[in-house]
Amino acid sequence: CSLPAGTTELDIPSELISLGIQWTTLQLDTLHKEFPNFTNIQDKQMCLLDPRGETELSCTDINNYKVCILGGILGSHPPRDRTKELKDKYPGLLVGKRLGSLQMSTDTACRCAHYILDKQIPFENIKFIDYPEIRFSKREAVEMPFRYIIDENTNKPILPDGMLKLMNKDSDQSIDDLF
């Protein structure tokens, strides 16, 4: 993945490092300089996961692209189409593909792309929950503003490790703790 200038290995979760994530701070069109196994990427060989893409990511796309870009500019709800910045910066290099019409958290988009491309599970066969409500007590809950994949064993949204603990800790704070 291409990360902001100044990023070091210490900034990347150890779980991703142990999984062998490849990352750089180079621009997308120069990935081949850092990763010799990437030939110079030509037009239309990068898949940009984008809620405004023209078609859905499909199992056959594993053969169509050398790189899949996701989670580059997640953040706003509702989305502000900041992915357009990448499309404008690299015209012709990127092909926009959707993972449905709703914004996902970065980890969910990664998991969804993995299911589709690596496990060959069609998008329509993946079970999701949209805007799940996470309850901490009888009176306290948080609505997550994204789409999540459902864990079929627990029937709950799959969240990043530590997310519930962090949200629970945040729920114990008062407004005074923020200043």
Located regions from the model:
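Glutamate identity and glutamate-enriched acidic tracts
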Residues: E9, E15, E34, E54-E56, ...
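S-adenosyl-L-methionine/SAH cofactor-binding core of RNA-modifying enzymes
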Residues: S2-P79
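Structured adenosyl-cofactor binding patch, chiefly the S-adenosyl-L-methionine
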Residues: E85-I134
